[in-house]
A protein has these predicted regions:
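N-terminal membrane-anchoring alpha-helices
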Residues: 2-94, 404, 422
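Membrane-embedded segments
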Residues: 110-156, 160-253
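Gly/Ala-rich beta-loop-alpha elbow adjacent to hydrolase catalytic centers
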Residues: 268-272, 276
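Hydrolase active-site cap/lid region
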Residues: 278-342, 348, 398-402
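Short beta-strand/loop motif that positions the catalytic acidic residue
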Residues: 345-347, 352-354, 358
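Conserved alpha/beta-hydrolase "acid-adjacent" motif
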Residues: 359-368
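C-terminal catalytic histidine-bearing segment of alpha/beta-hydrolase fold enzymes
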Residues: 367-370, 375-422
């Protein structure tokens, strides 16, 4: 009996051991299968992210343009660009400059805002139907108020045509023909200088940080003309290229100079600095009169180094094939924005502004462009100025316009070269 019990127990123990061995074997096989599947998925993800996507980028001109210009990123949402007053800009005209792009054989509509200078708005506030609360806030920064007031037109006889338009009994400021006549007369009649603003990628001329700069410049008594290149805002729905956006800027520049003889300055921000330097080089090649000077805010030296430093490329910049699949294809498709080349091709004075805590266009690239300009530009050409904004101020990529010393820098720079021809 005892022997039978022992045999039964031994059999049960043997069965349990066998079951345990089978379970452990199954666990090992399952673990191997999971590890193998995980490795396969990891390799597949690696291949897709680090090989397939760069190769798609290399061979897709459309994708290259999309990533560079970022026209699909729009903010603020539901912004009506036809009504600049909804963005906080009174006495501002929305217009469209249409020109023929001969190379692409298409008509291009470039959407534009023309923001009137403060002194003009204050002078004709009643006629322009601006409320008292708004007018009371339209003052220049205190540090430059005296200098800015000197820029204002004091000769009342200059305003004869303006007054005739504004004092019509049937005046309708919402009428497009009336707006055109009125705003173009302000360019002709006044002596206020004009700033043509060239924005960077993403959004439109209505982005809040851009509007903030317009308000600052108008408070310094400058006309501000801001445009959206093709593909941006409510401009022509055409895929942008470097050549295309430069010619859009040229069309608006020629629109301004066809009306006014007053000094014009270019102000480029981020990608717009590449547009500005290329435009100045183009004007020189075409032997056309250029602007008095140019401001480059958050500039870079060329698109090859900028895309390598941009946050978007963080995953890819250390790949051995980064240049082969990303940089070189863009250059082959004429997406270069070579400010380090163009800055040696025009004579106008240059003011560079860059924040140390700029994480989109690193400070080092702006300073590198400055050093290149010092080495390559003619000794008799317009000077180069570089202003560094400390990282402790937290201006980043977009908000140098909030620097308390910026109005003094801008007014002094523009006044210095206002009557100079290079």
């Amino acid at each position: 009996m005892r022997r039978a019990v022992i045999i039964v127990k031994a059999t049960s123990l043997s069965s349990a051991v066998g079951t345990l061995r089978m379970y452990l074997s199954f666990r090992r096989r399952l673990f191997k299968r999971i590890c193998l599947t995980t490795c396969k998925i990891s390799i597949l993800v690696f291949v897709i992210i680090f090989i397939v996507l760069p190769l798609i980028f290399k061979f897709s001109f459309a994708l290259q343009k999309s990533i560079l210009f970022l026209t699909f990123i729009t903010y603020p949402p539901n912004l009506d660009l036809k009504k600049p007053e909804k963005s906080g800009l009174c006495a501002t005209r929305n217009l469209y400059v249409t020109y023929r792009d001969q190379e692409e054989d298409i008509d291009v509509d470039v959407a534009v805002w023309h923001v009137l200078p403060n002194d003009l708005v204050r002078r004709f506030g009643k006629e322009l139907q601006i409320d008292e609360a708004t007018l009371s806030n339209m003052t220049a920064p205190e540090d430059v108020r005296d200098k800015v007031d000197k820029l204002a037109e004091n000769d009342s006889s200059k305003y004869g045509n303006l007054e005739r338009i504004l004092h019509r009994s049937n005046l309708n400021l919402a009428d497009e023909a009336t707006q055109k006549e009125l705003f173009e007369e302000t360019l002709r009649a006044t002596t206020n200088d004009i700033v043509l603003y060239l924005h960077g990628n993403t959004a439109s001329r209505g982005a809040s940080h851009r509007v903030e700069l317009y308000k600052l410049l108008r408070s310094l008594n400058y006309h501000v003309v801001a445009l959206d290149y093709r593909g941006y805002g409510d401009s022509a729905d055409i895929s942008p290229t470097e050549r295309g956006v430069v010619y859009d800027a040229l069309a608006v520049y020629q629109y301004i100079t066809s009306i006014s003889k007053n000094p014009v300055y270019l102000w480029g921000h981020s990608l717009g600095t590449g547009v500005a330097t290329h435009l100045l080089s183009l004007l020189t090649d075409m032997s056309l009169p250029g602007p008095r000077a140019v401001v480059l805010e958050s500039p870079f030296n060329n698109i090859r180094e900028e895309i390598c430093a941009h946050p978007f490329s963080k995953l890819y910049r250390h790949l051995p094939w980064f240049d082969y699949t990303i940089s070189r294809p863009m250059y082959a498709n004429e997406l270069r924005f070579e400010s380090d080349q163009h800055i040696a091709e025009f004579r106008q004075p240059v003011l560079m502004l860059h924040a140390e805590d700029d994480h989109v266009v690193p400070f080092s690239l702006g300073y590198k462009l400055y050093r290149t300009a010092l080495d390559t530009r003619g000794k008799s050409w317009g000077p180069i100025e570089f202003h560094r904004f400390e990282k402790t101020s937290h201006y980043g990529h977009r908000y140098i316009c909030r620097a308390p010393n910026l109005p003094e820098i801008v007014v002094r720079f523009f006044r210095t070269y206002r009557d100079e021809q290079y």
